[in-house]
Amino acid sequence: GDGKELCQIALARSMQTGDYISGYYRDQTIGVAVGDLTWPQYFAQLYGHPDINFDPHSGGRQMNNHHATRWLDEHGEWKDQTSRINSVAGISSTAAQTPRALGIAYASKLYRERPDLTEHATLFSKGGQEVCYTTIGDASTSEGMYFECINAAGVLQVPIIFSVWDDGYGISVPIEFQTTKSSISKALAGFQRNEDGKGLEIIEVKAWDYPGLLAAYVRAAKLAREEFVPCLVHVIECTQPQGHSASGSHERYKSTDRLAWEHEADCNVLFRQWILENKYSDESTLKAIDDAAIIEARKHQKDAFAAYMSSVDVDRKAYLRIAKNLLDSTNEPSLLEPIIEELNQVSYPIFSDLVKAGRKTLRAFRFYQGPAVKLLRKWLTDLEDKNRRRFSSHQMSESVHSPLLVKEVKPLYEKVPQQVDGREILNQSFSNFLEDPRVFILGEDVGKIGDVNQTLAGLQDKFGPLKVTDTGIREISLVGQGVGASMRGLKPIVEIQYLDYILY
């Protein structure tokens, strides 16, 4: 988030309880500003601490800055989404945060426009007033799925705010090689709503202009929340003071003039000047805040690292105790000491180093029996089981709602079964599903003509266009629409018309 802090603070101030953020890996300022992320959690994720008490966002399974609200409780039941701001798990596949944001916003539309969902909305919506914010860097707006979702949002008129952090580069590639007219807001100008029809509200604002940023997000949030007008907030003149990543400094590809401008025009520098010029604070107070922040950050970093290493150290010490017992009972130092020495040479061992040492020790003492070897084998088995829980559990639901626990219902046939087309069976099955208010179907040609294969024939007339909904040819945003809506307690059925379309 370096160089994008101020716009993220302004965005956060426009959010309300029940809103959603579907962002990417530069949004830590938003997470902290809305109270969804603490600095101890930030550093715990940096070190990959596989304990949700330290890293509740991912339990050490995601890269740093991939923040996520916990949507389910320990029993696999939904938590109340209306009483907090909700963060969808951050993602590194650039633009992939956008399709699911479309679905989250679409759920607000359904909760507002379908009274039959009222009793199901308790944990998910208060009258459909929730806005979904989604963020992206300027270079990633070139991804096809981004354009697809922009178009879908304009068609659907859903409460979504697209934010673009524009620092003029995609790693080393400048914007003139990325975006038509070197500006995503200019390139998308045809989507601007006007007397010709509905569309998006497009707002351009500078990354260092705090009053302008506040006004932009207040305006966008009001339009999205009250009128269901999708908005694009294009934040220009962002900086990237640390370069794109650890792969190299931005000094490799930015001109001397550009580097000098970034030093002077960084949002934090100009924000500080604005505070002082308007006498909201003084230099000594701001310096005290700076100094305290550095001390606090270093403390949280050290504490997080110590907490992570202590979790490893418990198993490391257990291994060393067993190794000593093994040495005492076998008197074979030549077999064991090289393994221990190799482990001790690892400055900061992780769990895989312990597994590696344990397996090497078992192989070295494969011809020995006795309590010490059995204890080592049990320790290794237990450690591998714990590691499976740490790193591989909950890939699918482990609650009572697991699909693997659904009991099979075998078909029953009459003595002389009636022969009907398969599409008729599917049609009746879909009709049965749609009796559940949470279920809806969307896809290409599913509505008016009832699907190209007639499996949905007559169902739009029976249940209405918000239950069986025609869409454009836009596969990735359809999938995202389903994913996002399902995260808000709904049960979408998304049709990708033909199997080969999934390649899109």
Can you describe what each PLM-predicted range is?
Residues Q28, D167-Y169, D209, V235-Q242, ...:
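Glycine-rich beta-alpha junction loops
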Residues A10, V32-L37, G144-E148, D166, ...:
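Short acidic, glycine/serine/threonine-rich loops at helix termini
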Residues R112, F124-E130, K181-R219, H263-A292:
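Conserved thiamine diphosphate
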Residues G1-K4, Y24-R26, G60, W78-P99, ...:
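Active-site nucleophile and cofactor-binding loops and adjacent substrate-binding regions
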